[in-house]
Amino acid sequence: MLLTLALAAPVLRAPSDRIFGAEIVGRHHDPFTVMQQFARPMSLGLYSQPLTDLTGAAIARGTGPVAAYNWLVLLSFPLSAIAAYLLARHLALTPAAALLAALLFAFSPFHVAQAAYHPHVAQTQWLPLYLLALWRCMDKASGSAIAWLAAATAAVTLSNFYGGLIAAVLTPIAIAAYWFGRARFGPHASRQLALTLGALGMVALAGVAFVWRSAPGVLIDRSALRFERGDLFRFSAKWWSYLVPPVAHPLLGGTARRIWAASDVTVGMLEQQVSVGWSVVVLGTIAICGWAAAFSRRRFGEPRTRMDGRVAGPGPRVGPSGPYAVPILAAVAGVALVCSLSPERTAFGVRFMRPSALLYPIVPMFRAYARFGAIVQLMAALLAGIGAAQLLATRRRAARAWGAALVVLAIAEYAVWPQSLSRDVLPTAAHRWVMQQPAPLRVFDCEPLTAESASVSWLTGGRVALADRIHDDCAEPQLASRLWASGFTHLLVRDTWERPWLDDHAGAEGIHLDAHFADADVFSIVPNDLVYIAAIAGFWPREHRGGASWRWMSGDASWTIVTPTPQPRVTLEVEMHAFHVARALSVRLDDGPEQTLDVAAKARAYRIGPLALTAGPHLLTFHSAEPATTADDVIANGDRRALSFSLGAWKWSTE
């Protein structure tokens, strides 16, 4: 717990303004979607993961949704350590070895990375608890052990979907490995196994019944929720991912990013954070070699030993060879590693199929098979604890020194910098500045409305609104009047091409810089014009080159213009040029007479009007006398848009 508090200190100082975790793959929408779920009344739906969702919603009632997200994630670290420690002690690790394994698992790169984006996947404590309940039940299937197994199975499944998948796939391997490594030597072993399997079967039937009742579509038509098979290659681990340093590492993170960039891994980089560390690999290898040597020495010629420790007489050893956990852990780790890989790989002309290829037709709604790496991390940590204990328990000083050095190196490989594990819940410093102003502002954010940006309005309590189909062009001439009429007092532009454009045209466009930050600017709106454009139709999205920007028009287009007061003589001056050849442009205000302009292929300013405007909205229509031309037909650039005229800067003036 103390280690968690130290790592999360920057977040704990402002738990409702900052969130835990390094921003490995940018501002993804997942954490903010979960926060919004916590803010709503508690409910269950198709995508609910009840144990995590209801816990987060309950915490949010007292702390708020952002802080609830942080607490839910942070609590998973000490809980994962406790669960791993209990499992380690059950497997007969010494207290020191169990503590090392618990810390390595709790603060593994996988857990730290997932905690930044996926609070459900970060609930890794349920995996070791499930294995503990399973293996304890195989030792002695008492009523309480069966009840604990049922509860652990429900917890690992209802905490997150991937936990249920991992448990379901690896349970047969975990049972087989534990049976051959230990359980078969216990009293009434076959009976204990039968009771355990029966309990699991009953829990599985109950789970299917629950899904059938709450979301029958999942069973009837699994393809309705399926991901594309190609996603499995992006979100599955590479075998060498387990050896690459985590990108959040304070010293080696830059090297890791360069490795992933050279391998063209971008979208799936988060799922590749499954590094176990070279020192952990070495310690685990020492544990395996130590077990193999002990097994070889004791296989013949020593007294047979029962599970209760009594000597049964000379001959081959029939009890588990100590430390008995090593082959169990190695077997589960190996299968989990293979399950975490992509569906197939071709080597030397031969295509090798992997478990994810077999699982995809059965459960096509899963794609991030790299998350099996959580079990690899757990098994590797336990093996490392055993290996470290073996080295530190030897009488040879050199071996003890190597053991201590490897433990220190493991800590260094898993090290993170607390400041890098904290980020603002808002996307830029400009957004934070807006929220710090004493007077409530109404700010227009030029960022398009996407899944990643949709949370901004909610997080700012409605102070900041994003670009939409009505307001989608921050480089539009005389934008200030339009935004002012819509109730906005400020304009926020992030670090895009629009930022330098607005800096250059601020005064002329009726905006003035109020706050400048490295990642965004905030402008106050002071409109210069009484005529503004409320809506635009028939134009393609704005383009830009250098200091100029424009929008291409199709064959017909329109502006909805608004003036709060009557304007008897208004002139519109607009920079235009025709596409490819000169064209005639007809312009009409409402139902009035047409004005025809002969627009050349070279850009220049044209005057429309004078126009007589009454107070209120008016429709200004544009019509190309010649049909719009497909760009690709003329300049063979692959552009299939139909173009007629380009409209650049414009200006209204009164006479």
Write out the residue ranges for each language-model feature.
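Signature aromatic-anchored transmembrane alpha helix within multi-pass, membrane-resident enzymes
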Residues: 197-202, 294, 303-306, 312-321, ...
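Hydrophobic, aromatic-rich transmembrane alpha-helices
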Residues: 176, 182, 276-306, 310-323, ...
